[in-house]
Amino acid sequence: MKKKVMLGVIAAMVVSMSATVFAGPSIGQIIPEEPQIVSTNVPEGAKLVVSTIDVTDEKTLDNYTSNETVKTLLKTVNDEETKPTIETVKEVLKEMNVEDVTNVETKSGEKVDLTEYKFTTPFIDIAEQIGDQITYKTNGDLEVKVKIDAAKEKKAEDLLLMLVDPETGKVVFITIDEIDPVTGELKVTLPFLGAMTILDKSAEAA
């Protein structure tokens, strides 16, 4: 764990309570919702902090991550003036050990073609905080329920959660455990915390 300057608008929560997560139907439109932590394998006194990731200021971004590849990915996806695609970040993903975007293994072992998916939310940051210490490591997998507006009227099989460790640059693609298409509530299992975004392969993807 180490001290970090948290970015953007920060919301904090005790793990047994709820917090504000930012997500939205399109890049640049971020809508707060309230997630729930399902898992109980969290340290006493821990909080989750959730924030937007400001990619417009180099010093702020440097405080978030020293990994140049992660910086490039975040800048590309969180650019409000463009519509990033998997194709535009393909070379960056190669540097993150995603060699073939058409044949990627998810955390659960499924094979997916990322080129079928579109980014529907910018990257946001989720971290664990104890006092003034921040960590992206978890004590095993962490089950989370979170409402995301972009997930409304969607099917679980059409969505992927992309999660990036800002410290190591590790990237994982996570299938959705459960979904409520009416509220947009997703249940997902996270192996660590960090920068996350939602990918959608349905025809209605933004």
Feature locations, PLM:
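A generic structural signal for short, non-catalytic loop/turn and secondary-structure boundary residues
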Residues: S16, N41-P43, K137
